[in-house]
């Protein structure tokens, strides 16, 4: 008798994507992050669901309801901090996942890559709206500053901002709709993840060498299920150390002050995972230019497949490109640091140079390095 997992309509889908999936025999730990992102998403949806049971999306009670969750709800504090720090873990995995794709040329699967970019935007939007919900000072002013950026759009900008606000400032209507969007988006993300995997399983996974692995595939289970469990245990360990020992390490103290429209915090800054984009935004003295640079800092990923000039897919055997890749990593860390600093000398010029270098590396230097490497192969 044929195994039921191979014949049952539902079990067959799970079997083909998690059990009998042919996977390259040489994929490294860098390929763990896809499953880790799935775990993060499930964790965020579950903790978020329990938080939503006790949260009220009203300007007068939002801040108090979060305090109530932490003080009065059974294990509310751990659910709240797992949700807040789970977002940080989510973004760490996201950045590493995208970095892996850049390094090993996974962007040569265009559908998978483009849906990944849409997913990145969706997760960033969800995280931004979630940060507004506790209705602390940084929530309120972050929402005000970021939504205000849309007013830079010519002609329709001001109307668009007021439409998003549901009034003439960030208020009750804004908070309510942000809660609604923050609740629905993770389910949209889940659907996009399914499409992301659908396209990935059409081609099969890439591998570190960048060479087709059709002649040397192994079943996903038990090899990579066991390998993924190690990644999951590591992720959960780091998350729980963060949650149980220093839950506010990555947060902003200003968010423990209730939102006050009459008092602006000295330094308005987003969560750490948006600081690189915030630094790029601030490095341009023009409002519209800054907004465009902010969007392009992520959207630039979409043109990377078009700029692939190398004869090899992966950077594994391309030392020049490797140097530029790690320079890009250092540049992003610099931008993250600058994003959290006040707008004054010398941070302004460092931010501007780091922003120029970011776009130069991705759009100019890396394609040129690939051409040089192609020519070196002829020697």
Swiss-Prot record:
GO cellular component assignments: mitochondrial inner membrane; respiratory chain complex III
UniProt cofactor note: Binds 2 heme b groups non-covalently.
InterPro entries in alphabetical order: Cyt_b/b6_C, Cyt_b/b6_C_sf, Cyt_b/b6_N, Cytb/b6-like_sf, Cytochrome_b, Cytochrome_b_C_euk/bac, Cytochrome_b_N_euk/bac, Di-haem_cyt_TM
Cofactor section: heme b
Positions annotated to bind a ubiquinone: 201
Residue ranges of the TM segments: 33-53, 77-98, 113-133, 178-198, 226-246, 288-308, 320-340, 347-367
PANTHER family (UniProt xref): CYTOCHROME B
Subunit structure and binding partners: The cytochrome bc1 complex contains 11 subunits: 3 respiratory subunits (MT-CYB, CYC1 and UQCRFS1), 2 core proteins (UQCRC1 and UQCRC2) and 6 low-molecular weight proteins (UQCRH/QCR6, UQCRB/QCR7, UQCRQ/QCR8, UQCR10/QCR9, UQCR11/QCR10 and a cleavage product of UQCRFS1). This cytochrome bc1 complex then forms a dimer.
Family statement drawn from the similarity comment of this UniProt entry: Belongs to the cytochrome b family.
Protein name, as recorded: Cytochrome b
The organism of origin for this protein: Hydrictis maculicollis (Spotted necked otter)
